[in-house]
Amino acid sequence: MKVEVMSSHRVHPEHKKASEETAILPVIDSWYCYWRTLAAIYLFDAYSGPELYTDLRQSLSKTLDDFPQLAGTLDNCNIQVEDKSGRSVRRTRVTWGGNTLGGEFIEAKTNARVRSLLPPSIQNISSFAWDRSDRTLRPLFPATLPETSGIRVQVTSFKCGGFGIALDMDHALADAHTVGLFIGHWSAIHTRMFTSTTTFPSQISLPNVMFNPQFVEKKVHETDNTYGSKMVMLDRARELPTRRPDLRDKSSQRTMQGNMFKPPPKPSAGVPYLLHFSASEYERITRGIQQATASPQITDQVAFVSFLWAALNKARARCSVGQAVDLHLPTSFRWTLGLPEGLIGSPLVAVMMDGGPDGEVCYTDPVVLATIITKTLERYTEDALLAIVYDASLRDSPASMLRGFERRERMEFTSGVGFGSDKLSFGCHSPVFVGPIILPVDNLFIMAEGMRTSEAHSSKWYKHGANIFVSLPQDVFRALLADPALINVELLGDI
């Protein structure tokens, strides 16, 4: 697919502040600074307005009035530690307003059709596997900017009258929740500006936006601040299997010192696939695992992650490509700490779970893995998360995207479920496809809601099925699909 970039504009809030403003980002959020969120693409089959680019650019600027920090730039500074040591630590700072560069809005066009980028036959009542390698979305991704740049948006018009919105931003400023919050507000504002509709039922529940970088750290200061309690917090934090910028893998104890910086890992060498599970198939898999464990603590998403983890381990064993892989699973502070729903930022950590020694049968049993995941996540209580924040406050924030990359092969799973993509509409049109543009590493599984193709009489998030985006070596993927547990997954095309 050829895409022609017609123009590029710097984008700022509609009511941009005349003077610059700055804020020190939370320490936990800063662990993800200088990484971009996984760029998402929203594809629409039509636009009802006369000026696609102008309309979207205007509504984007208006939306940034509530999210001005997302158009800011990042840099590093040193601050004094609040103790008697006089020690300073490196922190990440965001600057917005004034003469800052802002974000980027790219206008592009292509002679391709939106439907050419969709699976040959999308039917939510069936489960399928689709090789996306010849349906690359990479040309729809915003052009590369310096790592300190703000939000990036590329709007691409298609020959058929449809359009695509590609979106990414710095991960320290926005986790998946914040991305969903932002696109939800943009959708609502755009619809109010450019349609005659007076009611917006899907956007009524949008929370007010809140930028309060010290919100979580204030919770730490509200706890017992005696020396003994602080040492207990440090011990607790360091006993947890939490991934840090200087500890990227459980097998690595290297620190960010001297010449131990390494270049980023090589890009994915695998093939991008989409696995779609129908609602009934998703329920069959997850309920089977939940019933086998007889534990009410095992949620449907934990059960499904354990299913995928076990299937990947079995596939790797069939291909003789290595031992069972570790699982890295993000856990958010938002719900455990009761953070405001409209709080923007990236308050999360990744939890590392052992894949087990080579040949261990239990690591191909999803029931065992579901129990391991649940018991590990149960350790991340409110007190544990506050301990992690305190421990992080004594460390430097990353100086750049170059950080320790000592790691072994692993599975990573992240969920985009529940962040409102099924409620979006720009004008009168809802997206016909939402997904990541690229998968930067192999064994990364991204789960999202299936797209609506018909009415579903259910309130469950997977009422239209569940989509899993993943990049795997072709032989591993073939072995994965040979698993009897995936017998109901239909192959689309020749993979």
UniProtKB/Swiss-Prot annotation:
E.C. code: 2.3.1.-
Pfam families for the chain: Transferase
Gene Ontology terms, MF aspect: acyltransferase activity, transferring groups other than amino-acyl groups
Purpose of the protein: Acyltransferase; part of the gene cluster that mediates the biosynthesis of abscisic acid (ABA), a phytohormone that acts antagonistically toward salicylic acid (SA), jasmonic acid (JA) and ethylene (ETH) signaling, to impede plant defense responses. The first step of the pathway catalyzes the reaction from farnesyl diphosphate to alpha-ionylideneethane performed by the alpha-ionylideneethane synthase abl3 via a three-step reaction mechanism involving 2 neutral intermediates, beta-farnesene and allofarnesene.
Alphabetized InterPro entries for the sequence: CAT-like_dom_sf, Plant_Fungal_Acyltransferase
Family: Belongs to the plant acyltransferase family.
Gene from which the chain derives: abl6
Active-site feature positions: 171 (proton acceptor)
Keyword tags: Transferase
Record PANTHER family: FATTY ALCOHOL:CAFFEOYL-COA ACYLTRANSFERASE, TRICHOTHECENE 3-O-ACETYLTRANSFERASE
Statement: the UniProt record of this protein carries the keyword tRNA-binding: no
Induction: Expression is induced during the early biotrophic stage of development. Expression is positively regulated by the ABA cluster-specific transcription regulator abl7.
Biological process according to GO: secondary metabolite biosynthetic process
Protein's name in the database: Acyltransferase abl6
